[in-house]
Amino acid sequence: WIMGHMVNKKYQVDEFADLGANAIEFDVTFDSNYKADYTYHKVPCDCGRTCGRYEVFTEFLSYVKNETTPGHPSFREKLVLLQLDLKMSYLTESQSNEAGKDMAKKFLNYYWNRGSNGGRAYILLSIPSIDNYLFLTGFKQQLKTEGFEQYLDKVGVDFSGNEDLDSIVNVLGRLEDEHVWQSDGITNCWTRGISRLQDAIKRRDEDESRYGIKKVYTWTVDYYPSIRYYLRLGIDGVMTNFPNRVEYILNEEEFPGSLRMATIDDNPWEKYVG
């Protein structure tokens, strides 16, 4: 998965898709009532990017619905994954639960269109901390309450705060969620060691538990040598400000036999066996 980073404006969806992204990541903030309000990343953000651009969340969601709905004039076939970077680390457990319920309602109304020709992309909920795990519980509960449990097949979870992997695995067991991605990374302004990333990859490959890690990705990787390096480690996704660079490298002689861009037919909740 080539994951376009910080795609918080409508026009950037097209910009990053044109550069080769088959997934986009956007930031989501919450108001004082724990309801999703904007696609916004405050200062600081990645080097070389402009912080602070935003859209009203529901308007942005409607826009990407059109981009991922077959038959719509704006449909982009290659755009198959939406990742939400949830800016909610300050919320309590009960507040996280309420935020999850609100998010499910917004997806039903503005993305899935309550079953009437809505968007088809997979959804990855990136939760900043295991302390906010009840967000996922609230999200699932709301879908079930409203009779749209089938959409759970499209939704996965990622705990994105670089926390202890054993602690994350324990929470995943309590959540009983099989659609698990695991991230590791840092802003492109800095470098980061790879020991935790390698541990996540090892767990993905060796852990056969039902609620184990299925995919591993790293962020934010922009430079050609770094992209090649991480691909060689065996990651499933690269979050980047330059999707065209990842696409270019995937077509180099080293990788075409083992790696390719994911399509809608590739299940993001299953381990890849190359």
UniProtKB/Swiss-Prot annotation:
Catalytic activity as recorded in UniProt: an N-(acyl)-sphingosylphosphocholine = an N-(acyl)-sphingosyl-1,3-cyclic phosphate + choline; an N-(acyl)-sphingosylphosphoethanolamine = an N-(acyl)-sphingosyl-1,3-cyclic phosphate + ethanolamine; a 1-acyl-sn-glycero-3-phosphocholine = a 1-acyl-sn-glycero-2,3-cyclic phosphate + choline; a 1-acyl-sn-glycero-3-phosphoethanolamine = a 1-acyl-sn-glycero-2,3-cyclic phosphate + ethanolamine
Keywords: Cytolysis, Dermonecrotic toxin, Disulfide bond, Hemolysis, Lipid degradation, Lipid metabolism, Lyase, Magnesium, Metal-binding, Secreted, Toxin
GO CC annotation terms, alphabetical: extracellular region
Transmembrane segments: none
UniProt key word Lipid metabolism: yes
Enzyme class at the top of the EC tree: lyase
Tissue note: Expressed by the venom gland.
Tree of life domain: Eukaryota
Cofactor(s) it depends on: Mg(2+)
Classification via CDD domains: GDPD_like_SMaseD_PLD
Residues the record lists as binding Mg(2+): E25, D27, D85
Subcellular compartments: Secreted
Any single biological process term in GO: killing of cells of another organism
Gene Ontology molecular function terms on file: lyase activity; metal ion binding; phosphoric diester hydrolase activity; toxin activity
UniProt remark on cofactor binding: Binds 1 Mg(2+) ion per subunit.
Family: Belongs to the arthropod phospholipase D family. Class II subfamily.
Record's function text: Dermonecrotic toxins cleave the phosphodiester linkage between the phosphate and headgroup of certain phospholipids (sphingolipid and lysolipid substrates), forming an alcohol (often choline) and a cyclic phosphate. This toxin acts on sphingomyelin (SM). It may also act on ceramide phosphoethanolamine (CPE), lysophosphatidylcholine (LPC) and lysophosphatidylethanolamine (LPE), but not on lysophosphatidylserine (LPS), and lysophosphatidylglycerol (LPG). It acts by transphosphatidylation, releasing exclusively cyclic phosphate products as second products.
Protein known as: Dermonecrotic toxin LspiSicTox-betaIII2
Organism: Loxosceles spinulosa (Recluse spider)
